[in-house]
Amino acid sequence: MIRTLYSDTPFPPLEQALIEPNGLLAAGGDLSPERLISAYRQGIFPWFNPGEIILWWSPDPRMVLFPRELKISRSLHKTLKKNDYQIRTDSAFTEVMQACAAPREDQAGTWIHEEMIAAYTALHQMGVAHSVETWIEGELAGGLYGVAIGRAFFGESMFSRATDASKIALVHLARQLENWGYGLIDCQMKTAHLMSMGAREIPRSQFSKRLNQLNALPGQNRKWYFDFTYPGRSEQ
């Protein structure tokens, strides 16, 4: 059994999460900024289908990318050195979420629905949720969004409309977070795409311990502006 959350119900200990399905911890509650921030501080995130009860997750193991461990392939390195794209931050947050929500060939549906978009847009307006965007010829070509608390970034989703556009955004995010002293990017669950860029699984207990340390550090709680430029590129 998992705990049912009401408006004032705290999250249960992470150790109470189910083994199958992996990480299911609680159901119910709401997507208020207070609830979401409390969840992310503890390494918990919402994931549920539209029209269904809110489900809260904390899988074990946890997929993370430590910024210093980022891997860049030769082909991506060549792409990153070009001057045919521009990186922007927090200039099209809701548009990025909507693009991430668009149907994909390998998915029957999407968990990024209007309720989620409204909730994370509220976090964005508070300076807690952020988007990193790759623009090509004035068009949004790819990007990602997530939540930043303390010195941890919790990646939620990414999309590409052009080759490597989401990877370009991730590289710039990782390098900028490293410059700011952030300790990790939470990737939630294992994917081959993220593993190819250096992400790896760690035990939930290790993730939770590191998260507690990063929560105590001051972060960039404002609209983001990146000062990182990939080596070999000119300023845009």
UniProtKB/Swiss-Prot annotation:
One term under GO cellular component: cytoplasm
Subcellular locations according to the entry: Cytoplasm
Pfam families, per database record: Leu_Phe_trans
EC id: 2.3.2.6
Function: Functions in the N-end rule pathway of protein degradation where it conjugates Leu, Phe and, less efficiently, Met from aminoacyl-tRNAs to the N-termini of proteins containing an N-terminal arginine or lysine.
Keyword terms, alphabetized: Acyltransferase, Cytoplasm, Transferase
Species annotation: Nitrosomonas europaea (strain ATCC 19718 / CIP 103999 / KCTC 2705 / NBRC 14298)
Identification of the protein by name: Leucyl/phenylalanyl-tRNA--protein transferase
Catalytic activity: N-terminal L-lysyl-[protein] + L-leucyl-tRNA(Leu) = N-terminal L-leucyl-L-lysyl-[protein] + tRNA(Leu) + H(+); N-terminal L-arginyl-[protein] + L-leucyl-tRNA(Leu) = N-terminal L-leucyl-L-arginyl-[protein] + tRNA(Leu) + H(+); L-phenylalanyl-tRNA(Phe) + an N-terminal L-alpha-aminoacyl-[protein] = an N-terminal L-phenylalanyl-L-alpha-aminoacyl-[protein] + tRNA(Phe)
InterPro entries xref list: Acyl_CoA_acyltransferase, Leu/Phe-tRNA_Trfase, Leu/Phe-tRNA_Trfase_C, Leu/Phe-tRNA_Trfase_N
NCBIfam families attached to this UniProt entry: aat
Homology family: Belongs to the L/F-transferase family.
GO molecular function terms attached to this record: leucyl-tRNA--protein transferase activity
Single biological process term from Gene Ontology: protein catabolic process
Keyword Signal among record annotations: no
